[in-house]
């Protein structure tokens, strides 16, 4: 039986939480997750990218700022994702989900689906028209995101080079949040 997830939108980004996120990010990468790096990854390698991601986070009501959603199972950081703003008025009606991660030790419990459902609930509460995300091809993520209600809307062949001679498609998914008539 799995523990209930508890979500927090815009938690205080303390040094401790930053470190927890970097540890989760490193662990997710080393478990084969496609979150910006390839294994073997170290926290020292992840920190510079994490600092840039953290720098975009604003406070509630801060227009154009990125937002952070975390999930905890008890005291353990179970999942993370970022709502990234395009910082462009003509695209302010949707957000890009970035760094969607679940702790490898907690995978297989439905936490990824719960994290995506909470992101959708928040997006609807904000009145967004949709949520977009990108994924690395060759990882089997199409099936997971399809179960979460996302539709593949584009693919750039070979756009992600994970190693010399190993290029993967950059896949774009969309979750339409507009009310259906």
Outline where the language-model segments fall:
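Conserved GNAT acetyl-CoA-binding A-motif
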Residues: 116, 123-136
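Terminal substrate-recognition subdomain of acyl/acetyltransferases
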Residues: 2-3, 10-13, 151, 162-181
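Residues forming the Rossmann-fold NAD(P)(H) cofactor-binding site
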Residues: 113
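Active-site-proximal loop/turn and secondary-structure-junction residues that shape catalytic pockets
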Residues: 101, 137-139
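Active-site acidic-Proline motif in GNAT/NAT acetyltransferases
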Residues: 103-109
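Conserved catalytic-core motifs of GNAT/GCN5-like acyltransferases
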Residues: 132-136, 146, 151-169
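Acetyl-CoA-dependent GNAT
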Residues: 7-99, 103, 116-118, 122, ...
């Amino acid at each position: 039986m799995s523990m209930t997830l508890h979500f927090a939108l815009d938690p205080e980004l303390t040094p401790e939480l930053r470190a927890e996120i970097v540890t989760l990010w490193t662990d997710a990468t080393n478990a084969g997750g496609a979150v910006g790096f390839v294994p073997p990854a170290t926290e020292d390698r992840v920190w510079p990218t994490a600092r840039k991601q953290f720098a975009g986070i604003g406070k509630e009501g801060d227009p154009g700022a990125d937002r952070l959603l975390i999930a905890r199972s008890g005291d353990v950081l179970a999942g993370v994702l970022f709502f990234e703003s395009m910082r462009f008025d003509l695209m302010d009606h949707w957000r890009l989900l970035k760094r969607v991660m679940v702790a490898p030790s907690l995978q297989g419990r439905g936490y990824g689906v719960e994290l995506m459902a909470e992101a959708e609930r928040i997006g609807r509460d904000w009145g967004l028209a949709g949520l977009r995300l990108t994924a690395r091809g060759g990882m089997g993520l199409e099936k997971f995101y399809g179960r979460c209600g996302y539709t593949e809307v584009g693919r750039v062949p070979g756009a992600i080079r994970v190693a010399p001679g190993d290029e993967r498609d950059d896949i774009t998914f969309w979750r339409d949040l507009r009310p259906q008539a």
